[in-house]
Every structure is written in structure tokens, then in C-alpha cells.
């Protein structure tokens, strides 16, 4: 899986950076967890402040487009983001559940 950043924009009102990216991959569309971890590594960012909002597969290609947001602090993240997006982006709970099995 390879991620290429298409655009980066800082939103001063919401105190976050907004990224549009392309994911080139083999096989099925990568999970939010996989994309979030890879994107956090590329951006050298705290994975807890990074939100991957959407990943949309391009028809007939091994490529997907995505949109992610990197917040300056956790307070702003919790104030702005919707609950279902936060649940979709939780990695700690998911990892703990997998280890407990």
C-alpha cells in the first residue's frame, strides 16, 4: 500500500490540517485502521489526533481517494468531530480487543 498526499490545507478556525490523498493498493480496499497508521507514519503525526473521514474506491482501479484531518489538540477534535467518525477511527480499543482474544 502506497499513499500519496494530493493536497494539504490548514484550517485556522478548526485548528487542524486537512489532507486529500490517494492510496494505491493490491487486493481489497485498505481498512481505515491500516490507512490511519500508514498516514500517521508518513506525516510523523500522533495517530490519536488524526481522523480519516473517508476512503472511496475508484472504479476499475487498485486505487482509492481519501480525506483526513490532523488536529492540533484533542479538545478541538472532540468538540468538532461527529461521534460515528470518532468510533470509526478508534485504534486503541480495537487493538486491545484483538489482543484479548
UniProtKB/Swiss-Prot annotation:
Q: Which InterPro entries match?
A: Nucleotide-bd_a/b_plait_sf, Ribosomal_eS24, Ribosomal_eS24_CS, Ribosomal_uL23/eL15/eS24_sf
**GO terms for MF:** structural constituent of ribosome
Q: Gene Ontology cellular component?
A: ribonucleoprotein complex; ribosome
Gene3D superfamilies membership: 3.30.70.330
Keyword list (alphabetical) reads: Ribonucleoprotein, Ribosomal protein
- BP terms from Gene Ontology: translation
UniProt keyword Transmembrane, yes or no: no
Asked if the keyword Acyltransferase belongs to this entry, the reply reads: no
Return the similarity comment: Belongs to the eukaryotic ribosomal protein eS24 family.
Protein name in UniProt: Small ribosomal subunit protein eS24
Amino acid at each position: 500500500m502506497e499513499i500519496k498526499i494530493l493536497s494539504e490545507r490548514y484550517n485556522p478556525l478548526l485548528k487542524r490540517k486537512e489532507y486529500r490523498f490517494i492510496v494505491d493498493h493490491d487486493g481489497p480496499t485498505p481498512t481505515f485502521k491500516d490507512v490511519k497508521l500508514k498516514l500517521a507514519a508518513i506525516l510523523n503525526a500522533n495517530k490519536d489526533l488524526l481522523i480519516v473521514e473517508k476512503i472511496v474506491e475508484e472504479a476499475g482501479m487498485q486505487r482509492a481517494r481519501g480525506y483526513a484531518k490532523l488536529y492540533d489538540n484533542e479538545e478541538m477534535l472532540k468538540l468538532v468531530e461527529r461521534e460515528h467518525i470518532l468510533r470509526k477511527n478508534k485504534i486503541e480499543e480495537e487493538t486491545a480487543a484483538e489482543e484479548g482474544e
